[in-house]
């Protein structure tokens, strides 16, 4: 009998029932997940957006004048993001380049990669304790102590992400550049890094999202102050970021309207950060294909 004459095997009734059950379960799980996400986003926005005013965004809190403002918290968040990225990007990218392009001891490289994976899974409150002992006890509670703590937290992520991006560059590109007489560093600078810049940039943007949403690592290191300072003065003094301020207003002061307003702002910022990462990746992919 030829292939055309063969009939497709009929599924048994129990088999069809099983497949329908699995398919229905997957659809139900997807629907519940989507509904829960929409409920959380909608609830936070409904509770938070009406409380977002220009006065809230542009003033400092004052107990004497019975005024609430989050301008210092916004500035502190910007300061700590900039300070963290200024340290963690050179360390993470440079370390990844060394491990991928220069290191010859594979056991050492494997040990470092394993340590980076392990550090990525440590709860952030432990980093807060480490940061307090290493930085706050020596330089005092300050945004700089919090930024250095966040550097330790985000370094493994940027290191491993950059490593994986470097490995996507074909070895033939390196060999071709070497064949043209280029040196090691010139090959890395002109061939390897441009070939994986999309992954590196995306990893850095996503790290901004993690820094933005971090609170536990800053509780014992950055402090709770709400004072407007310049960049360098701000790094040397204690200050609350938006996430820490959210905790303070909700837990300590019972200002749930302000807490939901901050939550809505953070949610929008997180969405914009993830959207930026997606757009950057898509742009580099189009450039590479075109």
Describe each PLM feature range.
Residues 84-116, 277-286:
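Transmembrane-helix boundary motif in ABC transporter permease subunits
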Residues 93-106, 110-113, 139-192, 202-207:
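Membrane-cytosol interface at the C-terminal ends of specific transmembrane alpha-helices
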């Amino acid at each position: 009998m030829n292939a055309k004459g063969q009939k497709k095997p009929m599924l048994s009734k129990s088999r069809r029932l099983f497949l329908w059950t699995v398919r229905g379960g997957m659809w139900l799980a997807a629907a519940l997940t989507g509904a829960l996400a929409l409920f959380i986003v909608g609830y936070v926005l409904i509770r938070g957006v009406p409380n977002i005013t220009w006065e809230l965004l542009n003033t400092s809190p004052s107990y004497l004048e019975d005024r609430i403002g989050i301008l210092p918290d916004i500035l502190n968040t910007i300061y700590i993001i900039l300070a963290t990225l200024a340290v963690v990007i050179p360390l993470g990218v440079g370390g990844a380049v060394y491990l991928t392009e220069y290191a010859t001891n594979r056991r050492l490289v494997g040990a470092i990669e394993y340590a980076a994976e392990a550090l990525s899974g440590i709860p952030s409150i432990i980093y807060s304790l480490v940061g307090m002992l290493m930085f706050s006890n020596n330089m005092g509670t300050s945004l700089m102590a919090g930024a250095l703590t966040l550097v330790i937290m985000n370094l493994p992520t940027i290191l491993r992400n950059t490593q994986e991006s470097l490995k996507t560059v074909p070895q033939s590109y390196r060999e071709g550049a070497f064949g043209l007489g280029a040196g090691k560093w010139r090959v890395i600078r002109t061939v390897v890094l441009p070939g994986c810049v999309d992954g590196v940039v995306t990893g850095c943007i996503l790290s901004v999202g993690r820094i933005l949403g971090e609170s536990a690592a800053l509780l014992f290191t950055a402090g709770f102050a709400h004072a407007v300072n310049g960049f360098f003065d701000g790094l040397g003094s204690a200050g609350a970021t938006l996430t820490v301020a959210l905790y303070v207003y909700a837990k300590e002061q019972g200002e749930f309207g302000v807490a939901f307003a901050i939550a809505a702002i953070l949610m929008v910022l997180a969405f914009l950060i993830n959207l930026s990462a997606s757009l950057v990746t898509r742009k580099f992919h189009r450039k590479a294909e075109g």
